């Protein structure tokens, strides 16, 4: 089973949990803009450099992320109490993070996962996140059953491309400011 099939299986499970049709996401993920990244995090050289993060705290922009991480560790997720906890690697498994687009789609019934990477002490870290995203023209609007009179839609309708591009623009706004200075 390829990684895209695993993502599709997870999306189908999520629709069942929300009480909507099982194949809701199938057509929306034809010709997707999914991305696989290969990431190297250099090691920390001293224990006191724990603040030197490999990746600062963030949430993923898209729907779901399937993350393969090597045995080095370093991934942390923020729990509901706001504490950072280790997400240790488990051989043969993937970490699943929900992203901001899925939070919008589900009207925050599913929340995006805040996470960060603390570079391991003395060893390189490698990870391979697969960001499962729909077709760029897919409308991102509140899913059926995720809104009612007491819980109206929280977000305006957008498309996958518009949403991702706006998030990238926000993330890299500092570059525009530097260029204008």
Question: What is the predicted function of each stretch?
Answer:
Residues 4-181:
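C-terminal flanking tails of non-heme Fe-dependent oxygenases
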């Amino acid at each position: 089973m390829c990684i895209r099939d695993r993502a599709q299986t997870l999306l189908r499970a999520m629709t069942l949990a929300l009480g909507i049709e099982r194949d809701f996401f199938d057509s929306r993920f034809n010709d997707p803009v999914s991305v696989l990244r290969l990431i190297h995090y250099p090691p920390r050289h001293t224990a006191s450099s724990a603040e030197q993060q490999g990746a600062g705290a963030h949430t993923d922009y898209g729907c779901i992320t399937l993350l393969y991480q090597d045995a080095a560790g370093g991934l942390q997720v923020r729990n509901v109490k706001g504490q950072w906890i280790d997400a240790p690697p488990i051989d043969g498994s993937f970490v699943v993070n929900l992203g901001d687009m899925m939070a919008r789609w589900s009207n925050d019934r599913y929340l995006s996962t805040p996470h960060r990477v603390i570079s391991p002490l003395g060893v390189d870290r490698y990870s391979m996140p697969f960001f499962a995203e729909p077709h760029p023209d897919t409308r991102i609007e509140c899913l059926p059953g995720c809104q009612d009179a007491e819980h109206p839609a929280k977000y305006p309708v957008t498309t996958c491309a518009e949403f991702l591009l706006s998030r990238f623009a926000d993330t890299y706004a500092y570059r525009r400011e530097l260029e204008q200075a």
